[in-house]
Structures are given as C-alpha cells and as structure tokens.
Amino acid sequence: RRDESWVRGAVCEQYDRIQVPVLAVSGWNDCWPNTVLRLLENVDAPCRGVSGAWGHVYPNLGVPEPGIDFLGLALAWWDRWLRDIDNGVMDGPPLLAYLQASHSPTPVPSARPGRWVAVSTWPSPEVSVMTLHLAPHCLDETTVVFSEVKVFSPVWTCLTSGEYMPIAGVSELPEDQGCDDALSTCFNGPVSDQVLELLGTPLVHLRVTCDRD
C-alpha cells in the first residue's frame, strides 16, 4: 500500500522540491532504470541524465560494458555547480543513452553491443509511443476483447531472470528464460524482420483479481 511512509521518501511525489542541479545516472540492468527519464521530464532545475548498459555500479566500472568517464563527468559537474566554473558541462546533451542491440542471453556481464545516442530533449519528439494490446496468448496492435486469462505461477518461476540488483560483477544477469516462459502466462507478438529501437519507460495497464488469500 502506498501510504505516507512511502510518499515521504518518494521523489515522484515532490518534484517541485528539487531546486538544485541534478546529474542523474543509472544503467538499464540496474533496478531503477526509469528514474533518470522521470527526473529529466519533471525537474525544473538544470538536469542531465546518463543511462548505460551497466548494473548497480558506478559507470566508470562499466559492468556490463561499455563504461564512461564518470569521474571526469562528475568532476566537471561539481566544478560547474559547486565552484561556479563555466566549463561547458551543460553544453552536452540532456540525455546520453546507450541503445543496446539484440544479443544472445548470457548471465555473464560482458560488453553489450549497441551505440550511444545523444537526445536533445526529453520527452523526445523523435520517440513515438507504441501501444500493444493483450490478446489470448499474444500481442496485437488492435484492441481485442476477451474475457479473462487465468494465471498460475509456481514459486520456482523466474529462476533464470537474474538478480534484481546486479552489483557483484559475476553471473547475475538474465540467461535463457525459455524454461520460465514454459511456467508462465505469456503474451508474445509475431516475429518481425523490422528494426525496432526502444528508448523510454514501458507502461502496462492490468485489471487483476485473486481467488486466494
């Protein structure tokens, strides 16, 4: 339940209280990958964001790779906002994001293929929203009316999903999750031969009921 104990420490409940410059950094394999984008979208103070491939580690460690010169970026940021040195750190893109390419699943934090993109504003007019509707055991771009889907997930489901907060630099990332799919209720879209680049925060709307305590 989202009561006052959660609201008190939640940034999303009080963006207007953030009045200092913000350098937001996270990784797509971290447990908080969406925070950077939300800060860029809602904070009125000077704000820049960096989202890389790494997990819950400093970007200069870069696990998974590629890393960045985070120490240099942090030093330039502090020189600008703590020492009032006009060093052009705000001339960089508001969002620097690593677009990961498709790769075979491996829990080992090796280098991830992809490329860095500089995004001039967020939300970006170059990013469009794609809506996919749940249909019986599939995804569809058109609305499909169906009554219900029953879900029963054994407690041992998701053993191959990886750690929630990968930090140790060992085999913590998702591996082939075919065995978990076999135990799950899945909604899969058709195989596409078109290039699809994803950048943003996924959102799902569900209506859920439970017949057990």
Predicted feature residues:
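Active-site-proximal cap/loop segments of hydrolase catalytic domains
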Residues: 1-90, 96, 102
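C-terminal, loop-rich substrate-recognition/catalytic regions characterized by aromatic stacking residues
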Residues: 64-213
